[in-house]
């Protein structure tokens, strides 16, 4: 059997195992013949998606029906709910008898095949033997985290967050396997650029890529300058395109918690750093210059940097009450 056939078999088997396990949560989402979202966040996502698909309100980024009477900006960016609404409308155009909630509650289960394919692609990019890839796929299928993210009714956006984590790793590895191919660098930049449109915090995916390039720079083993510049340009432009539909961005807001000018600023920093690494060779003088530039660029977002550090170190009391911040293994035992 060829390697491609083995990888295809691993993907199919592991995806079906993961999907079957995720279907175990059906009883939490199917009550008295009615499909319902599983959890508070999933409920609000479903409400916003259904409004965008069928209601006169259409798609909204400011909700005047929450935090009454003043209303509130929705911290979740536009892309996930908008695309889900478009997907629902398209599906019902072909299959008009489909129950809208039946469709939405099962999207996370179907999406297992996408995330599993990316995981297999990552393992293949690492040149692992097929039995190791099979073991990784089985671990993904049996993981409580997979069941938590992909369970029936989990309309929350977290399974798509996982998609972008895997997509960035996959595109980065493919590029580094063939660093001369500028098109692969561009795909990495696009993945990094559009990720915040699905969750504000996904701009953080730029950090490990920058760290990786910084290590290559110190070792004098960077990819060619053309590929580096292609990465920088595609990252900035795709971020800008992802920001254009965002009302907070068009209103001139600069907030970490909203898809705004903050995210374009982060992309600009990453673009500048990548360009500097591509233009200047490593030495003590250039290292000092790069460090100085980095510190100056952090000043406008220093408060957000401190807040992010507190989040990573779990120095926020509120985290104890947020399900997403808890161990998936604890969840699997106590559910």
Feature map (PLM): residue ranges:
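Membrane-embedded helix bundles of polyisoprenyl
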Residues: 14-22, 107-126, 131-176, 181-217, ...
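Alpha-helix initiation and N-capping motif
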Residues: 46, 80, 132-135, 315-316
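Conserved acidic
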Residues: 10, 177-179, 222
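Membrane-helix interfacial "entry" motifs
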Residues: 3, 65, 73, 93, ...
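Start-transfer (signal-anchor) and selected internal transmembrane alpha helices
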Residues: 1-29, 134, 276-294
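Transmembrane catalytic cores of multi-pass membrane glycosyltransferases
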Residues: 161, 186, 191-335
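Membrane-interface coil-to-helix junctions
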Residues: 16-114, 143, 156-159, 163
């Amino acid at each position: 059997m060829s390697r491609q056939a083995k990888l295809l078999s691993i993907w199919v088997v592991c995806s079906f195992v993961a999907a079957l396990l995720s279907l175990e949560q059906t009883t939490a989402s199917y009550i008295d013949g009615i499909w319902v979202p599983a959890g508070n966040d999933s409920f609000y996502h479903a409400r916003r998606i259904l409004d965008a698909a069928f209601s006169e309100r259409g798609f909204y980024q400011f909700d005047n029906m929450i935090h009454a009477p003043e209303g509130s900006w929705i911290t979740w960016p536009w892309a996930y709910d908008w695309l889900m609404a478009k997907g629902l409308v398209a599906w019902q155009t072909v299959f008009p008898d489909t129950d809208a909630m039946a469709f939405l509650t099962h999207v996370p289960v179907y999406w297992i095949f996408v995330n599993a394919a990316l995981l297999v692609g990552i393992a293949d990019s690492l040149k692992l033997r097929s039995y190791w890839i099979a073991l990784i796929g089985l671990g993904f299928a049996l993981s409580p985290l997979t069941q938590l993210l992909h369970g029936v009714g989990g309309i929350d956006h977290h399974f798509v967050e996982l998609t972008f984590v895997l997509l960035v790793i996959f595109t980065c590895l493919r590029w580094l396997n063939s660093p001369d191919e500028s098109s692969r660098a561009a795909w990495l930049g696009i993945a990094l650029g559009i990720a915040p449109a699905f969750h504000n915090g996904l701009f953080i995916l730029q950090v490990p890529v920058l760290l990786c390039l910084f290590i290559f720079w110190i070792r004098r083993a960077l990819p060619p300058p053309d590929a580096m510049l292609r990465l920088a340009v595609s990252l900035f432009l795709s971020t800008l395109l992802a920001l254009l539909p965002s009302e907070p961005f068009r209103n001139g807001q600069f907030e970490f918690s909203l898809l705004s000018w903050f995210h374009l600023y982060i992309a600009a920093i990453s673009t500048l750093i990548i360009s500097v690494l591509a233009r200047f060779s490593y030495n003590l003088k250039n290292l000092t210059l790069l460090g100085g530039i980095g510190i100056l660029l952090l000043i406008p977002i220093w408060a957000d940097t401190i807040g992010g550090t507190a989040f990573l170190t779990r120095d926020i009391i509120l985290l104890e009450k947020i399900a997403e911040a808890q161990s998936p293994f604890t969840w699997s035992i106590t559910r």
